[in-house]
Amino acid sequence: VKRLIAIDFDGVIRIDDKPAGGVFEALNKFKNKGYEVVIFTSRNLKEVRKFLRTYGFPNIRATHSKPDGACAYIDDRAIKFTSWRDVIKGF
C-alpha cells in the first residue's frame, strides 16, 4: 500500500508563477521514501499540467478535491488543529 501525500498547488507548489523554492528536493525525498504525491487545486487542471511540464516536474496526478486517506495534507491556508481554544486564538 502506497502512502499518499496531498499537496495544494497555489502557494505551495507554485509561488508567484514559479516553482516554490525547495519543491523539487521535497518531491524527490517523498518519492525516495515511497510516498505517492497528489496535487489538489481549484485551478484548471490543464493549466496545472502545463505548468508542471514547463518546469520539468515529474509525472504527478492532479485533482480538484483533497484525496481521502492521505497521511499528510500540505496547504498554505491550513490551520493545524490542536484544540478549539488554540484555533479561535487566531481569529
Report the location of each language-model feature.
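HAD-like aspartate-dependent phosphatase fold
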Residues: 1-91
